[in-house]
Amino acid sequence: MATMIPGEIITPEGDIELNVGRSTCTINVANTGDRPIQVGSHYHFYEVNAALQFDRDLAKGMRLDIPAGTAVRFEPGDEKNVNLVAYAGSREIYGFNGLVNGPLE
């Protein structure tokens, strides 16, 4: 039997698929501001910095479809497509910029 190392994560062989079966979309985002903006993996994309221009209605209830703990950075003048994934669970959003603070449906 192998010795377990504290904090060690043992994963199965092969690739790990993230967010399987959840609704996704791709949106074009432009940073119209004069400063870089970084958005974390679990931030409610609908509520990100107002200098990011995109279809906010499409982003309601969605977050970046990237691994937990990572982020996407938008430099001033940047325009790029990002993939979003729907929040799961109770689908209640609290905090962030206070634009929802309750159930999404």
Swiss-Prot record:
Coiled coil location: none
CC annotations in GO: urease complex
GO biological process per UniProt: urea catabolic process
Listed Pfam families: Urease_beta
Record localization: Cytoplasm
Catalytic activities: urea + 2 H2O + H(+) = hydrogencarbonate + 2 NH4(+)
Name under which the protein is recorded: Urease subunit beta
